[in-house]
């Protein structure tokens, strides 16, 4: 699966804070639910979304998958993929997002995996972050949405739903805390951008 490397996305997330209220409102107006799978951000993205009053109607759950074993056992990421590529990989990020959505029973899954530092990891430089996004095929088609990367299709044998999932590469600067914060902002921006299509009756923001 090809990965879209958006320098502009990384720059925006470093320069401005994204408002999780917008994300929750957009999901709520569409009747969509969201779940998370976090590695380097370790629950910070979930916590940021949960700060919004009424987020419980949208945010159903999240998995902190810091270890490879948890990515495999709780998010159903392929053991072969993890062995071949390591945890910091575009396809792993996409699979994590699918795993979050299927495990939590949501329409959308978003994930984070990367190297926060201070040392490189698995041959990946500090600041290398992949964000994953997954959405059910039915929702994508019904709302006319477009994922921000070339996607692969995944099947879920349990729910019988089909998923589209892709990933986004961020090349971030700063210390460990700055990289983790920017990854959280990037995750919020990724979902917000995905939901930019305005359904009938939803007022435009700004």
Would you name each region that the model predicts?
Residues 1-206:
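Short alpha-helical segments enriched in small residues
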């Amino acid at each position: 699966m090809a990965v879209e490397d958006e320098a502009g996305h990384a720059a925006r997330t470093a320069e401005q804070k994204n408002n999780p209220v917008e994300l929750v409102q957009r999901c709520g107006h569409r009747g969509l639910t969201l779940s998370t799978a976090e590695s380097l951000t370790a629950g910070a993205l979930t916590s940021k979304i949960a700060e919004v009053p009424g987020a419980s109607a949208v945010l159903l759950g999240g998995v902190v998958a810091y270890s490879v074993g948890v990515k495999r056992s709780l998010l159903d990421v392929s053991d072969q993929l993890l062995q071949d590529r390591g945890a910091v990989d575009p396809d792993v990020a996409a699979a994590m997002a699918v795993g979050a959505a299927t495990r939590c029973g949501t329409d959308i899954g978003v994930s984070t995996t990367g190297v926060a530092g201070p040392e490189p990891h698995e041959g990946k430089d500090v600041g290398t972050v992949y964000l994953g996004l997954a959405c059910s095929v039915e929702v994508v088609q019904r709302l006319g949405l477009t994922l921000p990367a070339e996607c692969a299709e995944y099947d879920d044998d349990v729910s019988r739903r089909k998923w589209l999932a892709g990933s986004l590469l961020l090349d971030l600067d700063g210390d460990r805390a700055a990289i983790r914060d920017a990854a959280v902002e990037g995750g919020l921006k990724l979902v917000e951008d995905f939901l930019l299509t305005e359904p009938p009756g939803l007022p435009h923001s700004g």
